[in-house]
Regions:
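Conserved small/polar residues in nucleotide/adenosyl-binding loops
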Residues: 139-141
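Metal-dependent enolase-superfamily TIM-barrel catalytic cores that perform enediolate-based chemistry
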Residues: 1-127, 134-136
């Protein structure tokens, strides 16, 4: 708990130093207006370092993508308003996993996109994949 508190406190300071809002979203996470996912992850990594910890050793970054909100006509909007294919999405996840030492990804694809889940599970082995919406929304399974 102490580690989380210190990292979150430093993350708040870094966000404020950039002149961004430290307002929080529905689930308690910061929701600054930033230009990219990488910018958000860079801020988190900086906060981890500023707190005296090592990303991937002392602290693990986990993502809750909530991909149901990013899904339209078998494509995903991961970076912007443009949509990319499942294969390109998986490539992006792999880049992010490597660069930021991601340990877990929750809801990386829409709950009904079985092909995407299957492809991801076959191609990413060392990261925990969590299907929150997949299981909680599909109670008939």
């Amino acid at each position: 708990m102490r580690i989380c508190f210190v990292v979150i406190k430093n993350l708040s300071k870094l966000i404020k130093a950039k002149g961004l809002s430290t307002s929080v979203g529905d689930e308690g996470g910061f929701a600054p207006m930033i230009s990219s996912n990488n910018q958000a992850l860079d801020l988190i990594v900086s906060a981890i370092k500023k707190s005296g910890f090592i990303n991937g050793k002392d602290v693990s970054i986990c993502l809750d993508v909530a991909a149901n909100e990013l899904y339209k006509k078998s494509k995903y909007s991961i970076h912007s308003k443009s949509y990319i294919s499942v294969d390109k999405s998986i490539k992006e996840y792999k880049k992010i996993i490597k660069k930021y030492k991601i340990k877990s990804i929750e809801d990386p694809f829409a709950e009904n996109d079985w092909l995407a889940w299957n492809k991801l599970m076959k191609s990413i082995k060392k990261v925990q994949i969590v299907g929150d919406d997949l299981y909680l929304s599909l109670i008939h399974i």
